[in-house]
Amino acid sequence: MLPALAVAAFVLSLVVQELVYPSLSWNRDEPVYLWHMEVLRAGQLAVPDGGHPDLLLPWLSAARDGEIFSQYSLGWPLVLVLGSLLGWSALGVAAGTALAVAGTWVLVEELTADRRVASLAGLLMLASPIIAVQGGVYLNYLFTLGLGLLFIVCLRRGVRKGSIWRLVAAGGLLGWIFFTRPFDAAVWGLLGAVPVVLHERHRLRALVRPAAWCAVGLLPLVAVALLVNLRLTGSPTEFPITVADPLDRYGFGMRRLMPKFDDFEYGPRLAAISTGRNAFWLPFFLIGAHLGIVLAMVGAWQRRREASVQLLVALGAAFPIAYFMFFGTNISSLTARLSGPIYYVPAYAALCGLIAIALTGIGRRRPGAAAILAVLLVLVSVPIAGNRLLVNRRLSEANEPWATSTEALDEPALVVTPPDGYLLFVNPFGHNGADLEGDVLFAMDNGPDVLTLVEEHPDREAYLQRADRPVVDLLPSEHPQTPEVELTPMVLLGGDLRVSGTVEPIPGADTTAWWLMVDDEARRAPIEVDEPLALEIAMRDLDLEDGLHTVDVLVGRGGNVDEAATHPALRRRFYVRAGDDDVVGLAPGTAARFLRPPGASDPEWLEALTLEHLRVDLVGTPVR
């Protein structure tokens, strides 16, 4: 049964990748792992920052000493590299999915010594929606689960049988977990070691030799991971994730994913809310949903005094407890309804084992009742799984325009993506591989340094990549919006450079006013707009100091001019460089509206393709 389960999980993963995730998933960790894979395939740990780390930094990555590198450890990207060397990186994902299902079978067989229970547990795991939903994405949760389950089995059997190879394998498996998800290695280590120590507590000296053999497998991988840290961060004990953002760490306090995002206080109250939200969605991704939870509780209660069942219960509770103090629990809980509670994936193996114990126990006494329960488990899960897969399919389709928008480019190009802070955060296909020499160089719209980047690449045609919806509308949701993505040629302008166009009163506003700012300082005082007004603003009249500048034309609304000046509504932004008695600007510039996003407490600038009441452009003589 074990080979059949592994093969079925492997095939399921490949099918789901093709049918549900044709254009990746909503989770932007995926493109980071794929970019990391490309870097490793090139024989590198990092890539050059091109002198513009603020423009070229991908999501969940760090910049240091002229280099850019992923915040993640190498364990999972190396698996993807192996798959790509075999011809298809998806093979690594499929192998991780198979490992999780096979690991469930192996652990339950080890704990119950009953292959029927193990086979049923493996089937239940395979049929749980979490396998289909997570088995098609380039994320490491199922892979790490498989490693952890096999680690426990190898450790237990190695100690029991005095098997050196099993003990070394146990250490190697735990080492690869450390190489993949360092924090998880500590949790899995405790789950494996504590039951063994308790069982052998009357002869602890006998565990010294097994521990030494485990160390033989563990320590080399730990050493490699620490050497990678030393190479990238300058310290063996500092991981790339804290270089990416020092506030991305375990424990309560001020926390943040990346420096350009808002920080927030993560404390016990928010941790409890987040854990509760994850716990609420957990059953929906388990075979039988809440019926499955009830049966798992029955199985745990019926054999509650058995150490094997106690270990399954501990496995089910360990990760929710361990991740309680990690702020990622809050962030992941916001999308748990879409893809499951990702940090709690190990709990599904434990729950399936307990359900299998309950069903086989019922089957011995009342076979008919057990059969009915098994059918009900499937009937409950089918509509839930179908619904979740359909939502994820739509979320994947919403990514597609980002890829297709650049397919027609037949010459070296520089594509400036939406101003969301980091490459890959909105456009999952916008990475630069292992160097900056690809046909398309992607850069973020993170300030006037974009103009310098365009000047430095005269061999590339520059384009502005924009969607017809603001970034906030493209975040993952139950009802994803598929954007239309446009590429607009960018051009450097000089000569008699000026902002030219018209501004109109905003309908419904008591007073509309416009003003101009340079680098967030007012250069033109607010002027009332009571009818369509022509604007002609020469850059040479702004007394710009030599260097790069951001020029904003703003329109506000209010009861009078002064009030309108404190309530901006529309903005056109341009980047210029002053020097040598001339000014060079980058057209066409960007547009934005000052709105309050859904669920937000404060308004913010949201990107727009056009502004009906502020139609101004940068006008001048092309300089290239």
Regions found by a protein language model. Give the residues of each.
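Membrane-lumen/periplasm interface segments of multi-pass, membrane-embedded glycan/lipid transferases
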Residues: 54-60, 208, 230, 235-303, ...
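Short helix- or helix-capping micro-motifs
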Residues: 121-126, 153, 174-178, 192
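Membrane-interface transmembrane helices that cradle and orient dolichyl/undecaprenyl
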Residues: 79, 109-115, 151-167, 177, ...
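Hydrophobic, aromatic-rich transmembrane alpha-helices
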Residues: 99-101, 193-205, 275-320, 355
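Transmembrane-helix motifs of polytopic, lipid-linked glycan transferases
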Residues: 90-112, 149-154, 295-298
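Signature aromatic-anchored transmembrane alpha helix within multi-pass, membrane-resident enzymes
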Residues: 2, 172, 189, 193, ...
